[in-house]
Amino acid sequence: MSATRRLQKELGDLKNCGVKAYENVECEETNLLKWTVLLIPDKEPYNKGAFKVGITFPVDYPFKPPKVAFETKIYHPNVDEEGKFCLPIVTAENWKPATKTEQVMMALLSLINEPEPSHPIRADVAEEFQKDHKKFMKTAEEHTRKHAEKRPE
C-alpha cells in the first residue's frame, strides 16, 4: 500500500472512529503529510481544555515514524516548552510500520493523563509534580485554562 493510500485510510479511520479522546482530525488541503488533531484529555488538570497536536509524516511513511508535537502550550513534565515529548512508540528504534496513527494518539493521551515524572523532559515540572503535587495541579490547571483550546461540546 502506498503512503498516500495508507494515510487516506488512516485519516478516514481516525475521523470516523467515534473516540471522544480526539476530534477535529484534519490534514492540510494540499498536503496529506501534515495533520492536526485536537487531543481531549479526560483527567485533571488537563480536562479543562483540549490540545492541538501537529503530525508530520515522512514521505517514506509507514517505514519511518511521524513527527508529533503539541501546537498548544501544555504544562507537563514530559512535554517541553516547544511541544516536543519523548514517546517510545514514535522513536526510530521502536517504530513498526504496522503502527497506526490512532495508536500513537492513544499512547500520547495516556502520557498526558498519566505523567511519567521519572522520565521527564522538564525536570523542574517533574520535581514539582513529585514534591508539591497540589501546587503542580493548580499551576497545570491555570496553564490549561489560559492556553488550551476550547473543548468540543
UniProtKB/Swiss-Prot annotation:
User: What is known about the tissue distribution of this protein?
Assistant: Expressed in neurons localized in the head and tail of adults.
Q: Which domain of life is it from?
A: Eukaryota
Q: What is the effect of changing E10K?
A: In ku354; drastically reduces wwp-1-dependent ubiquitin ligase activity. Marked reduction in brood size
What range(s) does the UBC core domain occupy?
Answer: 2-149
Task: Please name the GO terms that the record assigns under molecular function.
Answer: ubiquitin conjugating enzyme activity; ubiquitin protein ligase binding
| Catalytic activity reported | S-ubiquitinyl-[E1 ubiquitin-activating enzyme]-L-cysteine + [E2 ubiquitin-conjugating enzyme]-L-cysteine = [E1 ubiquitin-activating enzyme]-L-cysteine + S-ubiquitinyl-[E2 ubiquitin-conjugating enzyme]-L-cysteine
Give an example GO cellular component term for this record.
nucleus
Query: Would I find Transferase among this entry's keywords?
Result: yes
GO BP annotations of the record are: animal organ morphogenesis; determination of adult lifespan; embryonic digestive tract morphogenesis; protein polyubiquitination; protein ubiquitination; ubiquitin-dependent protein catabolic process
**Keywords assigned by UniProt, alphabetized:** Transferase, Ubl conjugation pathway
Q: What EC number(s) does the entry state?
A: 2.3.2.23
* Keyword match Cell membrane: no
List of catalytic residues: C86 (glycyl thioester intermediate)
The record, for Pfam families, names:
UQ_con (PF00179)
Under which main EC class is this enzyme filed? Answer: transferase
Q: Deletion: any effect? A: RNAi-mediated knockdown very slightly reduces viability and brood size; phenotype is exacerbated on a mutant background which enhances the overall efficacy of RNAi. Increases sensitivity to paraquat and reduces lifespan at 25 degrees Celsius, but not at 20 degrees Celsius. Abolishes lifespan extension completely on an eat-2 mutant background. Substantially increases embryonic expression of sup-35.
Q: Cite the record's note on assembly.
A: Interacts with E3 ubiquitin-protein ligase wwp-1. Interacts with RBR-type E3 ubiquitin transferase ari-1.1.
Recorded family membership: Belongs to the ubiquitin-conjugating enzyme family.
Function according to Swiss-Prot or TrEMBL: Ubiquitin-conjugating enzyme E2. Accepts ubiquitin from the E1 complex and catalyzes its covalent attachment to other proteins. Required for diet restriction-mediated lifespan extension, probably acting as part of a complex with ubiquitin-protein ligase wwp-1. Acts redundantly with lin-35/Rb in the regulation of pharyngeal morphogenesis during embryonic development by negatively regulating the expression of proteins such as sup-35.
This protein is called: Ubiquitin-conjugating enzyme E2 ubc-18
Task: Name the source organism.
Answer: Caenorhabditis elegans
Q: Which gene encodes it?
A: ubc-18
